[in-house]
């Protein structure tokens, strides 16, 4: 059906993605080889992984108009901006990259007339070779995606005070923005710490939230509502009713609230939570701008990893430090950025496309990276973040401290030896 070998919808997609093969077919049938053509596309088409093969066929796009500020969305979804582009078939070697001049930036809300004269066009750098890490990017012990503990207004708490009373977090997406956050009391046995990508700084975990979850008392690897006390049972029934009422996708086979939270065993796969695993567990943010932030969860031994984060249980603390050091190394910034699934998401790609060697205890280089990482971790923990609001500002403060101390230079020197084909050359 799809001889172009482009994406037509994932395994669990609710509909077939026909836009990509439709454009390919229309151009082949109705346009000559060098004809220009224009399309309204979701902005994700410029970077997202499902459009990768499509971009290989039509690699050059000229932006005609940014339609993201239109009051009526052209494509479904609460945040699906789109653009009007034109393009033509070109050879891979003719591709271009657009960037702002050094030291300048072009605001996302800038008009095209303002942005166009400031854009510098250049040939793209050669792509980094792609090869999955062993065992971090594939196999039974690879990095795993965190759970999907949503909606926040039903099951997530910012702070859990000592008096036992709580109010859930206000959701900010979809119909859940209209849902009044639930509140309750006396559920301390069912409230568990949670870490997400937003808690990751380089070499440091900052803050946490709490989730209301029915962890089984009889089987430490499962969730079970029926085993919980009456107070929890009443709360969960109320949450279940709200879940069905506000469920954004209206369909007959709506999963229960627990089934939604346990999507692909996101929570139970992490159970049982053991204190001994804390120093061996590595976590990094699955989405963000350009920067990957990795840290050990040493001070949060019983925290469940939530969405927007990937985690890995290392065999020992040295391996965990080694991984954190490699993932935070500034010299891998370009390779990690190039590996992204889309403009927003890293997903598993930093370890799926960059061949990080498996940790070898007897390797002097691996041991040196782990030791430098330990020093970075100590400095990151001591860095004063008082008065700094927002993750970007806190991240910059930690990076500045590591750079000024010379630790980043030492880390880069070691990682360049480890991954010479993926590290940026020293200026």
For the regions a protein language model found, what residue spans apply to each?
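Extended hydrophobic/Leu-rich segments
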Residues: 112, 246-249, 254-261, 385-388, ...
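Signature of N6-adenine DNA methyltransferases within the class I
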Residues: 1-180, 302-309, 315-316, 344-347
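Juxtamembrane/interface motifs at transmembrane-helix termini
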Residues: 59-60, 207, 342-345, 385-391
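A generic secondary-structure signal for well-formed alpha-helical elements
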Residues: 30, 34, 44-45, 58-66, ...
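Polybasic, glycine- and aromatic-enriched phosphate-binding surface used to engage nucleic acids
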Residues: 20, 27, 125-371
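Non-catalytic DNA-recognition/assembly elements of restriction-modification systems
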Residues: 355-427
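Short, solvent-exposed loop/turn and secondary-structure capping segments
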Residues: 49-52, 206, 336-338, 381-382
């Amino acid at each position: 059906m799809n001889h172009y070998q482009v994406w037509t919808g994932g395994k669990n997609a609710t509909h077939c993605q026909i836009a990509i093969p439709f454009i390919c077919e229309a151009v082949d049938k109705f346009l000559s080889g060098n004809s220009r053509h224009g399309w309204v596309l979701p902005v994700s088409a410029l970077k997202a992984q499902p459009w990768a093969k499509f971009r290989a066929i039509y690699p050059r796009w000229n932006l005609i108009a940014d339609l993201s500020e239109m009051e009526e969305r052209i494509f479904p979804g609460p945040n699906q901006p789109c653009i009007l582009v034109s393009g033509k078939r070109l050879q891979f070697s003719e591709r271009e990259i657009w960037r702002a001049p050094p030291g300048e930036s072009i605001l996302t809300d800038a008009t095209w007339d303002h942005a166009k004269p400031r854009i510098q066009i250049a040939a793209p750098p050669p792509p980094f070779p792609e090869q999955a890490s062993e065992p971090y990017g594939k196999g039974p012990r690879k990095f795993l995606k965190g759970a999907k503990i949503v909606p926040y207004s039903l099951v997530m708490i910012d702070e859990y005070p000592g008096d036992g009373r709580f109010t859930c977090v206000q959701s900010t997406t979809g119909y859940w923005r209209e849902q009044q956050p639930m509140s309750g009391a006396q559920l301390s046995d069912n409230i568990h710490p949670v870490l997400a990508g937003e808690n990751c700084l380089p070499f440091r975990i900052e803050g946490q939230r709490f989730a209301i979850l029915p962890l089984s008392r009889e089987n430490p690897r499962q969730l079970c509502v029926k085993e919980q006390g009456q107070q929890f049972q009443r709360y969960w029934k109320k949450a279940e009713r709200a879940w069905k009422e506000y469920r954004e996708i209206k369909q007959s086979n709506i999963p229960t609230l627990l089934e939604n939270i346990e999507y692909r065993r996101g929570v139970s796969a992490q159970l049982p939570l053991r204190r001994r695993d804390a120093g061996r567990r590595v976590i990094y943010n699955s989405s963000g701008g350009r920067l990957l932030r990795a840290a050990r969860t040493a001070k949060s031994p019983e925290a469940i990893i939530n969405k927007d984060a990937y985690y890995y249980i290392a065999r020992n603390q040295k391996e965990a430090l080694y991984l954190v050091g490699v993932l935070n190394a500034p010299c891998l910034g370009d390779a990690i950025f190039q590996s992204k699934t889309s403009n927003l998401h890293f997903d598993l790609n930093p370890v799926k496309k960059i061949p990080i060697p498996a940790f070898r205890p007897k390797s002097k280089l691996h041991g040196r990276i782990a030791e430098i990482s330990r020093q970075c971790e100590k400095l990151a923990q001591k860095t004063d973040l008082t008065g700094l609001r927002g993750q970007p500002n806190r991240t910059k403060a930690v990076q500045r401290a590591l750079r000024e101390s010379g630790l980043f230079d030492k880390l880069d020197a070691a990682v360049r030896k480890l991954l010479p084909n993926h590290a940026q050359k020293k200026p």
